[in-house]
């Protein structure tokens, strides 16, 4: 029990240190992604919105148990990350290439695809023009 407890504390401390570093990177994140803030689209059921803060990345990763909140994903200059939701419940996280405007990945809980997976990808692809416009704004 002692080793498990120590490991849990170490993991928590590591996450807290990563989160502190991420907060320090918030300004750089805003410079990279600020032009996309407020970008959101829907098909009537699914709402896909840009993650607008480093904290949003952590919350998204923690809620869906995948890596978007780690490895400084928020500082990747050539991708944009969205949260796909239904009734404000997170369904999948979507990463879009800002080079070719194709979905690189879309992952639900524990990196699984959901029943809405294809629909989410189609929604993002259908709205690529809106995203592209923000790049030149």
Task: Indicate where each model-derived feature is located.
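Catalytic-core elements of nucleic-acid end-processing and repair enzymes
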Residues: 3-137
